[in-house]
Swiss-Prot record:
Keywords: Amino-acid biosynthesis, Lyase, Metal-binding, Methionine biosynthesis, Zinc. GO terms for molecular function: aldehyde-lyase activity; methylthioribulose 1-phosphate dehydratase activity; zinc ion binding. It comes from Sorangium cellulosum (strain So ce56). Its cofactor is Zn(2+). InterPro entries: Aldolase_class_II_sugar_metab, Aldolase_II/adducin_N, Aldolase_II/adducin_N_sf, MethylthioRu-1-P_deHdtase_MtnB. The gene is mtnB. This is Methylthioribulose-1-phosphate dehydratase. HAMAP family: Salvage_MtnB. It catalyses: 5-(methylsulfanyl)-D-ribulose 1-phosphate = 5-methylsulfanyl-2,3-dioxopentyl phosphate + H2O. Pfam families: Aldolase_II.
Length: 212
């Protein structure tokens, strides 16, 4: 997979990378059916995001839409932005260092988020691949993924996520119970790296049959 880690100056280049990212995740079974959504910050502060209800392994440029910081379409489009656009907008508002966001629905993330919903978090520790996360320098550190209740009140969920991130930095991602993983990075390249690292650790935890 080829990504450039760009400054996201143009829609055309970002759309191409989001299409490639979507296909990358779909091929690994992380976005079954039409699940998942992906976005990146554009140079003017608006966001390019995948349209709602589209299979992520077969996206075209028309399946990428542009929204403003509040999640509203910036121009006429036959496509609708993802129903979870507000969750993407929350992350970009939370930190100017976030340049791309990914939401996947892998088997491991779905199962473990259900298993750990009552505890409220999934703890991943002792995995060497954790050092792929930006700022992580040792495998002995613990990666804490909060688990939020799956709700259709996306605005309220975004508020809950923002409060957790403010109270417990650094946060590398979070889970929605029975739903999947949200993670992010400074650009698409780092976001891909974070997806792979976290999904790998979740796979390992699932195979191990439990979490401490």
């Amino acid at each position: 997979m080829s990504v450039r880690g760009t400054s996201f100056a143009s829609f055309s280049s970002v759309a191409a990378e989001l299409i490639e990212l979507s296909r990358f995740c779909h091929e690994r079974g992380w976005t079954p059916a039409t699940s998942g959504n992906f976005s990146a910050r554009l140079g003017d502060g608006s966001l390019a995001i995948t349209a709602s209800g589209r299979p992520k392994g077969a996206l075209g440029v028309s399946d990428i839409v542009v929204v403003n910081a509040d999640g509203r379409l910036t121009g006429p489009s036959p496509a609708r932005p993802s129903a979870e656009t507000a969750l993407h907008c929350q992350l970009y508002r939370h930190s100017s260092e976030i340049g791309a966001v990914a939401h996947t629905h892998s088997r491991a993330a779905t199962v473990l988020s259900r298993r750990c919903a009552q505890e409220g978090y999934v703890t991943l520790s002792g995995y060497e691949v954790a050092k792929a996360l930006s700022g992580m320098t040792t495998h002995t550190a613990t990666v804490l993924l909060p688990v939020f209740v799956n709700t259709q009140d996306i605005r309220r969920l975004a508020e809950d996520v923002d409060a957790f991130m403010s109270a417990h930095p650094p946060v590398y991602g979070y889970l929605i119970a029975g739903h999947g993983l949200y993670t992010w990075g400074s650009d698409i390249a780092s976001t891909i790296r974070h997806i792979e690292a976290i999904e790998f650790m979740l796979d390992c935890a699932l195979l191990e049959g439990g979490l401490s």
